Amino acid sequence: MEQTLRWFGPNDPVSLQDIAQTGATGIVTALHHIPNGEVWSIDEIIKRKVEIEHQDGDPKKGASGLTWSVVESIPVHEDIKKQTGNYIQYIENYKESIRNLALCGIKCVCYNFMPVLDWSRTDLSYTVEDGSKALRFDINAFAAFELFILKRPGAENEYSDEQKQKAKSYFEAMTAEDKVKLQQNILAGLPGAEEAYTVEDFLVTLSAYNHIDRQALKNNLFHFLKEIVPVAESKGVLMAIHPDDPPYPILGLPRVVSTEEDLIELMNAAPSKSNGFTMCTGSYGVRADNDLPGIVRRHGDKMNFIHLRSTQRDEEGSFYEANHLEGDVDMYEVVKAILEVEKRNNSKLPMRPDHGHQMLDDLKKKTNPGYSAIGRLRGLAELRGLELGIKRSL
């Protein structure tokens, strides 16, 4: 596997020099400063590419040892997901961004089709047994937010009486500070998210999906794929759709990339090597019914990007992000399956350790949730060792 790390641009507390010291050679990043829906110009792409691939970001200096390997992500505009407003132009802009990236030698694009929120957590500093901090999604906390803070119309019909009682108890035990923090965690956006909302704005945004059910959102995704995949294929670009996180409906919104069946449908909608997926074990792994090694073995030829992460589930559907080799994901079997695919195809797929615990000296620093340096360094080192051990034993 090609070892990569995510970098959020010049304002990321983890610098490119830091990343170079981890042993990673690939950078996963995006042009976060460009508004959703606008074309990524060749000038902007080259500017970022030089910043990554040359020492001190100076084109006159030698290579830095890092390569911009994967784009994560070109955001899909909400109008495209809803097929409203200026969606036709936004699709054309997306195609142009793909063409421009290809001209600059960047040939892998991760993206998602999650409506409104990119990914959701209720606790950004959940303390685990060893004292490090992880990200957590608590189903009762989320229900408390939806029912009693957001007060989304119709939400009460989507929870059982038992769930509503647990949510009420959770809410009543919260302090005013707890409520503000929970709201911020969900609405203020996590790293990589492109939008942040107030409660009022969020309710309006959600209401735009009142008449878009799961099948309608799937149809809109399939239309998008039929438009962009031929362009990507013609330019040698590999698209890699990221699964829903968490992989089940929330906030009354449909989810369309949560299971192996979803993957099969979307890949069949526009058959091409360029219409592939991101194997995110942390997202798919939240569902016990997702066979992660099986998905890799059955669909590895369309696996264009890899996020390796583990979660620890409970019986209610809550989870926290476990250490990379712990939790519910059988990382040994997943990595073994990936290496089998690479051997079969004579390929080297880009992989990043997805998230990491905030630990050691990073506990004293301001970090992007999930993206502190030391936790990801630990994850990358563990995964590198696992890969070496499996390779030597094959």
UniProtKB/Swiss-Prot annotation:
Enzymatic reactions: D-mannonate = 2-dehydro-3-deoxy-D-gluconate + H2O
Cofactor(s) this protein cannot do without: Fe(2+); Mn(2+)
Pathway given in the UniProt record: Carbohydrate metabolism; pentose and glucuronate interconversion
Enzyme Commission identifier(s): 4.2.1.8
Presence of keyword Membrane: no
Catalytic EC class: lyase
Span of the signal peptide: none
GO aspect biological process, one term: D-glucuronate catabolic process
Entry keyword annotation includes Manganese: yes
Sorted UniProt keywords: Iron, Lyase, Manganese
A molecular function (GO) term: manganese ion binding
Function: Catalyzes the dehydration of D-mannonate.
Protein family per UniProt: Belongs to the mannonate dehydratase family.
PANTHER family for this protein: MANNONATE DEHYDRATASE
Record protein name field: Mannonate dehydratase
